[in-house]
A protein has these predicted regions:
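Hydrophobic alpha-helical segments and their helix-loop boundaries in membrane
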Residues: 1-195
């Protein structure tokens, strides 16, 4: 069970969206090895810690602290720790995705969001995160794709068909990313996408 804990924690936090968007920006620029995976995963982890800090603080205050002090039982601590994570997931989940998993679980239509079991919320949250990450990735890809198309068109019109367009477009894509302060914009968009 403990070996599944890291995977479970990754799936119910902001990590999924962040790592997918960071991976897509790396591919959009055209340098699949830069930044290296360790840097990308480290950045994704620290951004996840940043985004999830209010949830972790609430868990510390309402569940972990009282449990270690002996004021509440383990079952109460679990219940109180689950509540902020559920709230975080429910703020991000799409209604359509939640309805899909309520239907697939063959549950009666819940009257309130609190009636939806956590085992239904988690997969709905995951596919909502995937959809959001791919939407953000698409928006990031478009300007870089335009640069590739323009460079390809110019090279074709000059009769330079043997020269790979990526070789010419890469410096322009890096220049664009640096000129618009891409890391700043990307981090800002990622963090604000969770509010």
């Amino acid at each position: 069970v403990l070996s599944l804990a890291p995977a479970f924690l990754i799936m119910v936090t902001a990590f999924t969206r962040i790592i997918i968007v960071l991976s897509l920006i790396r591919n959009a620029i055209g340098v699949p090895q830069l930044p290296p995976n360790t840097v990308l995963i480290g950045l994704a982890l620290f951004l996840t810690f940043f985004v999830m800090a209010p949830v972790a603080q609430q868990i510390e205050r309402e569940a972990y602290g009282p449990f270690t002090d002996g004021r509440i039982s383990q079952a109460e601590a679990y219940s109180k720790a689950e509540a902020p994570v559920r709230t975080f997931m429910l703020r991000q989940v799409r209604e359509k995705d939640l309805a899909l998993f309520v239907y697939l679980a063959r549950l009666d239509q819940p009257k309130t969001i609190d009636e939806v079991p956590t085992y239904v919320v988690v997969p709905a949250f995951i596919i909502s995160e995937l959809k959001t990450a791919f939407q953000m990735g698409f928006m990031i890809f478009v300007p870089f794709l335009v640069i590739d198309l323009v460079v390809s068109t110019i090279l074709m019109s000059m009769g330079m068909m043997m020269l790979p367009p990526v070789l010419i477009s890469l410096p322009f894509k890096i220049l664009l990313f640096v000129m618009v302060d891409g890391w700043y914009l990307l981090m800002r968009a990622l963090v604000l996408s969770f509010n």
